[in-house]
Design a protein with these regions (language model features):
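Short aromatic-enriched loop/helix-cap "lid" or pocket-rim segments at secondary-structure transitions
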Residues: 98-100, 127-129, 180-184, 229-231
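Conserved class I S-adenosyl-L-methionine
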Residues: 166-196
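Class I SAM-dependent methyltransferase SAM/SAH-binding core
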Residues: 54-126
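Conserved Class I S-adenosyl-L-methionine
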Residues: 133, 199, 209, 214-292
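A short SAM/SAH-binding and catalytic strip from SAM-dependent methyltransferases
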Residues: 134-152
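Glycine-rich phosphate-binding loop signature in dinucleotide/nucleotide-binding domains
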Residues: 50-51, 129-135
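Class I SAM-dependent methyltransferase Rossmann-like catalytic core
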Residues: 1-51
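A short glycine-rich, Lys/Arg-flanked "PGG" loop and its adjoining helix->strand segment in the class I
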Residues: 152-167
């Protein structure tokens, strides 16, 4: 009898190990950087008009790689304006890395950082308890809506905190990605707990449409090299498989039939393409920019 499957998030150390490997093996941050360089300036064009201070809220800011790029674009548009950058991030380890990154980055003199070591839900609950509803000029939620209990309520809450000329930016996997194919088919077989759920930009679109909110959608092509997943016993392959299935030690704990089906699925054109002897998983993302 094999040991039962466990959600990857129940082992934070392994989760972050697999997440870092995912970033190293994918164009995830590269395609986000291209968006921030090319299209973000237009998004933040008028968020600070007439303001002496710009308030930015990063929900799930992680280790700050993308946050600092966003800040540089806001600074370029509004030089010398004071920026308050608040970060909601439940992982102390990620906050530590974020602070290190800030310390190593120049030109942040006019940015005041405040870190809140809590989840989005804990932040909302605390603000409600303190009867506070601070408004923001820019809120971003990058690759974090998988980790909230109630997606529509979370979007509603943070949308309600937007200033009249503000924007809410969400990045999630596309509804046209390997993730969508894999998770729509096998998600119910993976051991998700209440820490994590599968949601894609297609789901967010439905939520926004039903709330009659105005938004723009950008498609970001991205891929992840999963060739090592098909090498029996390969440590990196096993970690990437854990990340794909959100399952701790998937290779060792999944029922053989489920493992066989998932490995087959990952090779199919709906999930991946073969290029130069590599298997490249479709990691396409969507950026959704929501108006107040």
């Amino acid at each position: 009898m094999s040991s039962p499957m466990r959600c990857l998030l129940s082992d934070p150390a392994r989760y972050f190990q697999s997440f870092r490997l995912f970033l190293a093996n994918s164009t995830e941050h590269q395609c986000m950087r291209e968006f921030m360089e090319g299209q973000l300036p237009a998004v933040v064009e008028s968020i600070g008009n007439g303001k002496s201070t710009i308030n930015i809220l990063s929900v799930g800011g992680g280790a700050g790689e993308i946050d600092l790029l966003i800040l540089s674009k806001v600074q370029a548009r509004y030089p010398r304006v004071t920026i308050n950058n608040d970060v909601i991030e439940p992982s102390a380890d990620q906050i530590f890395k974020y602070k290190e990154r800030v310390a190593e980055t120049s030109n942040l003199e006019n940015v005041k950082f405040t870190w809140h070591e809590e989840t989005a839900y804990e932040y909302e609950s605390r603000m409600n308890a303190e009867k506070k509803s601070k408004k923001w000029d820019f809120i971003h939620m990058i690759q974090m809506l998988y980790y909230v209990k109630d997606v529509p309520a979370t979007i509603r809450y943070f949308h309600s905190l937007l200033e009249p000329q503000a924007k809410l930016l969400i990045i999630l996997v596309s509804g046209f990605s390997g993730w969508e194919t894999l998770w729509k088919k096998y998600g119910s077989s993976f051991p998700l707990n209440d820490l994590c759920s599968y949601v894609s930009a297609a789901d967010i679109k439905r939520i926004l449409d039903s709330a009659s909110l105005k938004y723009q959608l950008h498609e970001l092509p991205s891929h992840m090299d999963i060739t090592s997943c098909f090498i029996e016993g390969d440590k990196d392959g096993e970690l990437l498989l854990d990340f794909l299935t959100e399952t701790c030690e998937f290779s060792k704990t999944a029922p053989p039939e489920l493992k066989r089906q998932v490995m087959e699925e990952l090779k199919k054109p709906e999930c991946s393409e073969k290029r130069d002897g590599k298997v490249l998983f479709n990691n396409n993302l969507n950026v959704i920019v929501i108006e107040p």
